[in-house]
Amino acid sequence: QAASLPLALRGQDLIAQASTGSGKTAAFGLALLARLNPRRFAVQALVLCPTRELADQVATEVRRLARAEENIKVVTLCGGVPLRGQIASLEHGAHIVVGTPGRVMDHLERGSLTLEALNTLVLDEADRMLDMGFFDDIARLAGACPPIRQTLLFSATYPEGIARLAARFLRKP
């Protein structure tokens, strides 16, 4: 956390090997909040997580970190929850979206989510997302983001798939 935060705050792309419970959510949460414009009601940060449980934990932590700021809206998009409520939440304006690749992809395809204002993409537990077969969804989501953005990749392990992801989506990590 201490090593990644200064780089992340400078807007650099980052690959960090971090296990669960290492404080990485605080590190990337502070970094994405630093880049956020609360007066712009558009999705400016997207955090992809492998599971609904992790997405819920991350969203809770980011909301806690955002309490110091005025009116920052965090929306969680995961499967197993009705789409209708999620669409309504997005229509009311969201600054940060935390979710699983499949459900975030659903919203992108439906047009209920747009990413053109995005400045930070976080891949949390990227190795687990690859193990679960999400490479194509991650690739499509990253392709829908503006090319000029910060990408932060966190992974407990560093398999070949992570190297491929990093080579494709990160700039000078």
Regions found by a protein language model. Name each.
Residues T114-L123, D127-P173:
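Post-DEXD/H (motif II) to motif III coupling segment of the RecA-like Helicase ATP-binding lobe
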Residues L5, K24-A34, A59:
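Motif I (Walker A/P-loop) of helicase-class P-loop NTPases
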Residues Q1-Q17:
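Conserved pre-motif I regulatory segment
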Residues I15-A18, L48-C49, S155:
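Residues at the beta-strand->loop junction immediately N-terminal to the Walker
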Residues R40-E109, A117-T120, A163-A167:
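Conserved nucleic-acid-binding Ia/Ib motif block in the N-terminal RecA-like helicase ATPase lobe
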Residues Q12-L30:
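Walker A/P-loop
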Residues G21-S22, G102-V104, D127-R128:
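Short glycine-rich anion-binding loops that position phosphate/pyrophosphate groups of nucleotides
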